[in-house]
């Protein structure tokens, strides 16, 4: 709708959601597709390369990045937290460029973390179609299970949950999960 409102002709922008391997297979095998560009995991990259090799398809890949968010001691902490929240929670962090790690210089850590948590607590969880909502559900049950498993593993490895770490109260339908902030996460 937004694209049409901005004058973009129908068919120029198309969003596909569903089973990534089957979608990729259909796109790669199509004679219409002339170039493939992907940002994703090494596993998915290998699958796409194998499929693209049959057609000698042009491919560009950015694989297995960890999108660090770095804050130095000369940073404007208010601006840094605003940018961090926008980057991290866009589409519930389900974007390949969403920061996975935050590296904060020690003398700014407490100030950054406290303000980041304060602002994150104000994010509204709910129906993603509601304009007042900042955080909708995760995309699939599988993704929800992966997030729950990741949180449990991270806690077992000694990280401390500073915020979230569970499904929000009152959201029994859908794949909702609270924004979660850890401290003392292992470097690997």
Predicted regions mapped to residue ranges:
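PLP-dependent aminotransferase-like
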Residues: 1-24
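Surface-exposed charged/polar residues within alpha-helices that form helix-capping/stabilizing sites
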Residues: 5, 25-26, 50, 149
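Short, surface-exposed connector motifs at secondary-structure boundaries
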Residues: 7-10, 28-35
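A broad detector of the eukaryotic-type serine/threonine protein kinase catalytic domain
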Residues: 18-21, 32-33, 68
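Beta-loop-alpha module in the N-terminal Rossmann-like domain of NAD(P)-dependent dehydrogenases
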Residues: 19-26, 40-47
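ALDH superfamily catalytic-core signature
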Residues: 35, 41-187
């Amino acid at each position: 709708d937004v694209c049409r409102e901005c004058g973009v002709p129908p068919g120029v922008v198309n969003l596909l959601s569903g089973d990534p391997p089957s979608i990729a297979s259909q796109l790669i095998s199509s004679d219409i597709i002339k170039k493939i560009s992907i940002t994703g995991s090494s596993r998915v990259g290998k699958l796409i390369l194998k499929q693209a090799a049959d057609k000698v398809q042009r491919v560009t890949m950015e694989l297995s990045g960890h999108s660090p968010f770095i804050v130095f001691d000369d940073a404007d902490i208010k601006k840094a937290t605003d940018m961090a929240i926008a980057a991290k929670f866009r589409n519930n962090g389900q974007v390949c460029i969403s920061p996975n790690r935050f590296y904060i210089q020690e003398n700014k850590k407490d100030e950054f973390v406290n303000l980041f948590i304060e602002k994150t607590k104000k994010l509204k969880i709910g129906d993603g179609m509601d304009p007042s909502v900042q955080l909708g559900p995760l995309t699939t049950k599988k993704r929800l299970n992966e997030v729950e498993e990741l949180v449990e593993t991270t806690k077992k490895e000694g990280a401390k949950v500073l915020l979230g770490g569970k499904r929000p109260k009152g959201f029994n339908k859908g794949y909702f999960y609270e924004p979660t902030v850890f401290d003392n996460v292992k470097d690997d």
